[in-house]
Every structure is written in C-alpha cells, then in structure tokens.
Amino acid sequence: MSSHPSTRRDRYDCFGDTASAVGRAAAILAGLQQVPADHTAVAAEIAMLADRSADTPDTATADRRLGRVLHSVLTRLRTSAEHANRHCVTSLADELAEVVGIIEECGRHTARQFAAPFDPTWAAWYRAEILRLADDADDAFRRLFARWYFDTDDLSAVAGMRELSEELEEVVRAFEAVAEAVPAIFADQPTELPR
C-alpha cells in the first residue's frame, strides 16, 4: 500500500505554523482600523511575528511554491505595517479600512484552512473564498482611486495613503497566490466530500 497520501498530508501540515502566523499578522494589521491607530505597535508586532516565521520547510517542488507564497504574505503584511508607521497613519481612508478588514478575513481563512483536516474539497472552497474576497478588495481600491485626490489638500498624506494602498494591494495578490498554490498539494488526490 502506498504511503504517498500520508506523506503529502505531512508535507501539507508542515505549513500550519506559517499559516497560523499569517492569520495572526493579518489580525494585528487590522489594528490600523482603529482611530487613532497605534501604527508603531502594529509594525513592531508584525515584524516580530515575521522574524519568528522566517524558515520555509524543505519540501517537494509544488510545496516549496506554497511555502514561498505563504511567506510572501507575511513579508507584504510586514511592509504594509512599516509603510503605515513611516507615514504615521492614525486614520485610514474608509476604503483602505475596508481592505484591511478583507485582509484580516483572508488571514483567518488561511489559518483555518491549514488547521483543518487534509481535504481537497475544503482547498477548493478556500480558493474560491479568497478570490471572492480579492474581488471585493479590488472594488474598494477602485472606489478609493476614483475619489481620494478630492478628499484632502495635504499632498503628503495622499502620497502616504497611495504607498500604503499599493502595498495592501500586494498583500491581496499574495493571498491570491496562496489560494492558487493550495490545490496543487492535492493533485491526484481523491476528493472526499465533508460529511
């Protein structure tokens, strides 16, 4: 009898700690929604979390891609927090607060996906949910870009928000990459519908 499925399961499970860190970092970033936001604390907490999660497990090729994109999410979350701190962001534009909430939800789903039993059906659900949330984020970005120059005469504040928004968009793209990489772990695996 082949041990391939259990081996793949073990390889999948080895990313649980990183996925959990992604979920925690996204929840910490959500602190930017508060008014006033403690941008210094948010940046410091995410930096510590990212430093503790720096190692990528040594796994098969498809799995290495998953490891890379999970760590990319952490890196992008860290950079977003650094931008918010650099520009002393204490109050987000409404659309960016919405995006930060979407990112928090993506992080929560990611942590749950890797904490759940090994099941390709749930991987497909996860992918669909992340892509749906990414569409919601894109809509928020479009609304922001359509109006934000009319909201303030403070060009430095606009520049800071633009830099932060660009990095938050990269966070969303990184979550999309995770969503696309997860199903590869289940290639050639029979699908078991949840009971």
Put a short name on every predicted segment.
Residues M1-R195:
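Cytosolic, long alpha-helical scaffolding segments
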